[in-house]
Amino acid sequence: MSTGKVVQVIGPVIDVEFPLDEELPTINNALKIKKADGTVLVSEVTLELGDGVVRTIAMDGTDGLQRGLDVEDTGDSIKVPVGKETLGRVFNVLGDTIDGGKELGPDIKRDPIHRDPPDYDELNPSTEVLETGIKVIDLLAPYIRGGKIGLFGGAGVGKTVLIQELIHNIAQEHNGISVFTGVGERTREGNDLYFEMKGSGVLERTAMVYGQMNEPPGARMRVALTGLTIAEHFRDVEGQDVLLFIDNIFRFTQAGSEVSALLGRIPSAVGYQPTLATEMGQLQERITSTKKGSVTSIQAVYVPADDYTDPAPATTFAHLDATTNLERALTQQGIYPAVDPLASTSTALDPQIVGEEHYEVATEVQHVLQRYKELQDIISILGMDELSDEEKTVVARARRIQLFLSQDFSVAAQFTGLPGHYVKIEDTISGFKGILDGKYDDLPEEAFRLVGSIDDVVEKAKKISATED
């Protein structure tokens, strides 16, 4: 392999000169720079400047670097560990373990993080719904196997618990694998998530990859590809259905913007990199279903200043199949998960995909909730007495629907003391159909809160009436 020398260091940007009689490293190749203290820094080739000089982006801090240090071309892009050995472990962008556990041996299989998306003839074009066991998602904003879902929510509205429950349900009911990728978020949150997942028993079916906000932009830009590479191995080699969580996809774009500016590229709209759509496409196109398995991605999306026309979220939206919106007002009413049933959307909510009955029940539920929303102003000003009998019925059923959209989570059982519920799609549909038809109008509203199927509602109603007697 070629060896060169460091000729310039500007922050995370390192220029390396190779002898003209040696082969230049290609774009995306990983270079190893041996520091004076014996440690090795990895950087990635991003530009060829000519005269044997390449410009690289460091994957770690450049403290202690100096001109003249030896640089070795690895001959390939960054390679990270893949396979069952990655489950239950935490990695950085380079695939090094950072959880303080046993180091992975040299024999473990490693894959390059830069790869092409699956060929057209390998894709599985079927639009199969992925059952999550969470009523509000399965009914109103169903996930497609191999699809991409955007998860919107502020701090403290239950994003982490929802992510944990999805990981738990995929592991328990589908025997699936999850890969969690923390991109440019707080180290404290990553640490909390690790210990919460350890406590709730889902860590052994999960691989975690972190490139948090204290990392250089190169690491934050590439860590999503590291997580995706681990997920692709489970899909293509193990034939698994994989859940890939990316928190936060905006930070991936943000890191790309920083790198672009450091490389001297002319910025595009709002200061973003001119290659924004290309970089996003290269990541998103690898997230798909093949004939061997699937990678279903759930991506937390930060929207700068709540501006949905900002190029970063707007570019992300073009790739999403479904959105799950978490609403703070619902947590204040004690409705968990706090998924907004009217704001959450899915391309899978189509009679040709989910079936006529599912589609009709879902649209009728949305219609009733929308009507209730419109009547709330009248109720708050004039009271229930001013409503017609038909409107009173709509309000009563809407409240039952709203409460029935909540349910207990298995991963929260250690805090609530209540067992979690996994609800099959057919049970979800029949339950809401019964509420819409008025079969359960005589049951108390409180019986619908934080339960699983409609049978649990009936049981809870019996207990409530028994205590009242």
Curated annotation (Swiss-Prot):
Keywords: ATP synthesis, ATP-binding, Cell membrane, CF(1), Hydrogen ion transport, Ion transport, Membrane, Nucleotide-binding, Translocase, Transport. It is found in: Cell membrane. Belongs to the ATPase alpha/beta chains family. It is a peripheral membrane protein. It comes from Pediococcus pentosaceus (strain ATCC 25745 / CCUG 21536 / LMG 10740 / 183-1w). This is ATP synthase subunit beta. The gene is atpD. Produces ATP from ADP in the presence of a proton gradient across the membrane. The catalytic sites are hosted primarily by the beta subunits. SMART domains: AAA. InterPro entries: AAA+_ATPase, ATP-synt_VA_C, ATP_synth_F1_bsu, ATPase_a/bsu_AS, ATPase_alpha/beta_chains, ATPase_F1/V1/A1_a/bsu_N, ATPase_F1/V1/A1_a/bsu_N_sf, ATPase_F1/V1/A1_a/bsu_nucl-bd. Its EC number is 7.1.2.2.
